[in-house]
């Protein structure tokens, strides 16, 4: 296969990341230098992000039968790269205290980023499966990186086993679909679904159901969510900022791309499965979050409901497909910056703790009285996650609710309302905890530096908070940008 100049330009972000991976490997082999590897990794990801500018004029474009670049893919790739950059920035102060090899952490993040970007542009089941694994395999190491902590290895082992089961379902589904379609690209599967006989359609539907089951596991939605709180609790906080954003954004992107070939509103089986999973995810995620005393487990359960809201865009008819792309992009922008800021603050507090662990919600009691700016940013982030007006989170939820109204999804709308009320109570419980007077029963062994706002992590946290507030008050620049790309 001959690749022309335009196709080579389209691959520029991937080529830059590959070059970064090779350089980091050589640096580790010859001379370990934590600072150099960290800076070079961040610069490589920034250059990859900037290279997306050169793709704007050449899209849409196919690179072989495996990859398809369009404006929507560029938007998701940008989100993934922002998440990866923030993860490397958050990880540096934590790794300074890490007693074992530090440089491999950045290598695993970059390799997983490579898989996430490749998955976003996948247009074929071969690249789809390979890139799912390319995301997951480094993630095993990242989750277990803090191996001296109590739950780290346990969480990694759980994720390895369950991820293996998920991959087996994915391969099983691909095999069933291929038996009828005779091809592995998404268009061939679409054609087999439309022109197959009644018996063959049942086989294709079963295969698609297995594929969706695997993706639902990666998105950690009900009923494939039971592993989520344990993984969140056992993983290093800086890893969670990557796991909960880049990993899920890439999987959602390929899910949206795959299902775009099928009219979910016309197919009753897929429509029913999606509707049931969405309702359960919204309600169960928020309901379980009510009873959590660990901040990481709390964020794990709320992530289930947040992805549940997002999946509503999959239920639109073809005539409203472009609006669903706009709604999902706006919602994901709010989701991305909320998670970056929230987990950045949790990481900052945890690394400042005497035991490098401040996961208990009680650790945050009265934080406002000692660190008012940090508490204010955390309050803003939680308010945005709850979907309160004047924040980007509200704009995202408003667009999702618009889809509910346009498509007349009244049962899902009722679940949306109940879930939002439960979520509001969950977030307000933590917000109020920040402004209570510090309890004498719970000693907070925190040593947060007074100049935290001038550190790289602090700058990222503050910028994320400003974005959530500014785009919540005046969202037109973001909406205009997304409309131009879609």
Swiss-Prot record:
Q: Which residues cross the membrane?
A: 8-28, 36-56, 74-94, 104-124, 125-145, 160-180, 201-221, 239-259, 269-289, 298-318, 329-349, 376-396, 410-432, 459-479
Under the heading InterPro entries, the entry gives: NADH-Q_OxRdtase_suN/2, ND/Mrp_TM
Its recorded reaction(s) are:
a quinone + NADH + 5 H(+)(in) = a quinol + NAD(+) + 4 H(+)(out)
Q: What are the EC numbers?
A: 7.1.1.-
**What is this enzyme's class at the first EC digit?**
translocase
Q: List the disulfide bonds.
A: none
Short name of any one Pfam family annotated for the protein: Proton_antipo_M
Alphabetized UniProt keyword annotations? Cell membrane, Membrane, NAD, Quinone, Translocase, Transmembrane, Transmembrane helix, Transport, Ubiquinone
Q: How does it assemble?
A: NDH-1 is composed of 13 different subunits. Subunits NuoA, H, J, K, L, M, N constitute the membrane sector of the complex.
Q: Which HAMAP family match?
A: NDH1_NuoN_1 (MF_00445)
- Tell me the protein's name: NADH-quinone oxidoreductase subunit N
